[in-house]
C-alpha cells in the first residue's frame, strides 16, 4: 500500500484537516485484514491532493513499479480532488497485468 495523503489520511489540525495519518495507522483501523494477506506500507507522500502535480505522479509511478516486483498488487491511497488525473497518468505509464487500485 502506497500512501500519498488526501482526506483519507487527514486528521484535524490548526487550519482544518491535514493529511498526517500513516499507512500503518490506516491498516490498524481495519483489524479484519490481518491474516488475510501480507500488506507492506510505503508512506510516499503526505499531500492534499489539490497539490498533486506531474512530479508527484512520476514519484508514484516509480514507487508502484518498484512495489510490483515483490507484490501481487498495489493499493494507492489518494485524495479525491485530483484522483482522476493521477489514475489516468498511472494507466498510461504502468504497463502491468497486476492490479493497481
Q: Which stretches of residues belong to each language-model region?
A:
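Short Gly/Thr/Asp-enriched flexible loops that form oxyanion-binding sites at enzyme active sites
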Residues: 76-98
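N-terminal glycine-rich anion-binding loop in soluble enzyme alpha/beta folds
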Residues: 1-68
Amino acid at each position: 500500500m502506497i500512501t500519498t495523503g488526501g482526506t483519507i489520511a487527514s486528521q484535524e489540525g490548526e487550519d482544518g484537516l491535514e493529511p498526517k495519518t500513516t499507512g500503518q495507522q490506516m491498516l490498524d483501523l481495519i483489524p479484519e485484514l490481518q491474516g488475510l494477506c501480507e500488506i507492506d506500507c510505503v508512506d510516499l507522500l503526505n499531500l492534499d491532493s489539490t497539490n498533486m502535480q506531474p512530479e508527484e505522479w512520476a514519484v508514484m509511478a516509480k514507487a508502484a513499479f518498484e512495489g510490483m516486483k515483490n507484490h501481487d498488487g498495489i493499493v494507492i491511497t489518494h485524495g479525491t480532488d485530483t484522483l482522476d488525473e493521477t489514475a489516468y497518468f498511472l494507466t498510461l505509464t504502468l504497463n502491468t497485468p497486476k492490479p493497481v487500485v
